[in-house]
């Protein structure tokens, strides 16, 4: 079980790490996507950003969190915390990006499929929250 769990723990965050790298390589495009879907940013937060556009700052923050939390899970260092952050990130992605309930036709099918895929990823992340880093990790703790 320990090797299987370690392999699973390593496989789950690959999608987040790859996605984060792609976002960082095209931060302007990711910021435009966030602007287009109007992810809410409180004015109190925007006031601290100085001259940086708020959606560019949000793009860097989200891509950075996705990358760091994904790597935390891969190496098994505070994997529970990394998985918790990615659970919130994934749920927000379904709510703000894959709003299939507001769509029709091919868009409905495509975004519903993405939302269901993300639900499966949420399940895997919940298992990591339940078990933790496990063996074969930097924390080297056996599952509870």
PLM regions with names:
Residues 1-36, 44-68, 74-144:
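Extended, low-polarity transmembrane helix blocks
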């Amino acid at each position: 079980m320990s090797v299987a769990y370690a392999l699973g723990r390593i496989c789950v965050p690959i999608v987040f790490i790859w996605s984060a790298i792609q976002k960082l390589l095209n931060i302007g495009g990711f910021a435009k996507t966030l602007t287009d879907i109007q992810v809410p940013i409180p004015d109190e937060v925007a006031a601290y950003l100085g001259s940086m556009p708020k959606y560019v700052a949000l793009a860097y923050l989200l891509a950075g969190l996705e990358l760091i939390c994904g790597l935390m899970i891969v190496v098994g260092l505070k994997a529970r915390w990394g998985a918790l952050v990615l659970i919130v990130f994934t749920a927000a992605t379904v709510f703000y990006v894959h709003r299939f309930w507001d769509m029709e036709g091919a868009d409905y099918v495509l975004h519903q499929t993405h939302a269901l895929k993300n639900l499966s990823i949420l399940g895997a992340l919940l298992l990591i929250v339940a078990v933790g880093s496990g063996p074969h990790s930097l924390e080297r703790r056996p599952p509870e």
